A protein has these predicted regions:
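Basic nucleic-acid-binding alpha-helical/helix-turn surface characteristic of O6-alkylguanine DNA
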Residues: 1-108, 157-164, 170-180
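Conserved segment of winged-helix/HTH DNA-binding domains
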Residues: 154
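Short glycine/serine-rich loop segments
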Residues: 109-151
Length: 180
């Protein structure tokens, strides 16, 4: 059985999906590859994993949490699963290029395939695909949009030792611009 609910967040409305034991999806509404509720899904706001997710997201956006502790069950191919598992190893506030991510899982000649798997991550933000950047350091390819990717990286740099004091002002300014 698949359960779903919607919630409002600092970077827009989100859809959460879960089975009876674990989170299966976190999507920004309107993002690329966003899941759409199906007739056999059950809308349920108060299952334990959704309650835990909301609490952890609130702490994350306040800078009080850098690593999520939730049961995850993303659905994908074995290759996608391997890529998503590698994404979980990228520390909050840090970034990694697609090439280094491919190297880290033993697929150095398959950077595009790794990039495609990153783009299909069904649990955005929790499995931190926003921390993957282009070889030249540029922000590229985020299903939730580059503005959200930029905001998430600024938020993380503000609250970790990877950031600087200027990041707080940048993050607050970005939140104002994003809300318009």
């Amino acid at each position: 059985m698949t359960y779903y609910t919607y919630t409002e967040g600092p970077l827009g409305r989100m859809l959460f999906t879960a089975d009876t034991q674990a989170l299966t999806g976190v999507y920004f509404i309107g993002q690329k590859y966003e899941a759409k509720p199906r007739p056999d899904w059950v809308e349920e706001d108060h299952i334990p994993v959704f309650t835990a997710l909301r609490g952890q997201l609130a702490r994350y956006f306040k800078g009080e949490l850098s690593t999520f502790d939730l049961p995850l069950a993303p659905r994908g191919t074995p290759f996608q699963q391997r890529v998503w598992e590698a994404l979980l190893q990228i520390e909050c506030g840090a970034t990694m290029t697609y090439g280094k991510l491919a190297d880290s899982i033993g697929y150095s000649s398959s950077v595009r395939a790794v990039g495609a798997a990153v783009g299909r991550n069904p649990i955005t933000l929790i499995i931190p695909c926003h921390r993957v950047i282009g070889a030249d350091g540029s922000l590229t390819g985020y299903a939730g949009g580059l503005e959200r990717k930029r905001a998430l990286l600024l938020i993380e740099k503000t609250h970790t030792n990877h950031g600087d004091t200027k990041s707080t002002e940048d993050t607050e300014q970005f939140k104002l611009e994003f809300a318009r």
